[in-house]
Amino acid sequence: MRYGNDKTENEIIESVIGFEPLYESMMKCKKGVLWKNQPAHYYLNGIEETIKLSDQLRNGTYKPRKTRKVKITYPKPREAVANAFRDRVYQRSLNDNVLYPAMTRSFIDDNMACQKGRGPDVAMDRLDEFLRQMFREHGLNFWILQGDVHGYYPNMSHDKTERRFHRKVTKPIYEMTTNVLRGQYEGSTGYNPGS
């Protein structure tokens, strides 16, 4: 087992496609979008829609709906992929219940990017600790390198990403993940997280 816990493969799959995890994902996905027709319809029929989605995932008849490409201009111009609400519910369940824990387990403590309980405030506190330590050890005789990886997600290799998932998750979860990614992103490079 690649997760470092005692769950069986069926329990792991159920933690993604079972009614409760999908319903919980719907509750998270609905925030701020219930004014739109598709999310409102799904939410108003939440129990029925979630049972239907769970059954489709269980019996292999689930097919993601066509994605739409959307241009975003703020805070910086970029292209995003808009998924159908039910597809977002499934993807959120897959991410929150299996992928996120499996992938972040190996991150260094100082990685603050897109992690629960981390963010700008924690990063600033950690930077403050480092600066104080460097000042104690070196006075004013030290340098800081500030950098940003420009175009990281748009240039990310699909093959490399899939290999990383393959190393971290079981085969059924890997297949679920690659089906989502391949269905949503064309070509051999580029992702748009948060879409």
PLM regions and their residue ranges:
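Conserved polymerase palm-domain catalytic core
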Residues: 56, 130, 134-195
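Active-site-proximal segment of RNA-dependent polymerases
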Residues: 2-13, 95-154
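Generic hydrophobic/packing signal
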Residues: 57, 74, 98-102, 131, ...
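Active-site-flanking structural segment that lines cofactor/substrate pockets
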Residues: 47-77
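Short, conserved non-catalytic motifs in the polymerase core
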Residues: 33-40, 65-92, 106-118, 181-195
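Non-catalytic, polymerase-adjacent accessory regions of viral genome-replication enzymes
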Residues: 1-51
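Non-catalytic, well-ordered alpha-helical scaffold segments
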Residues: 10, 20-23, 47, 51, ...
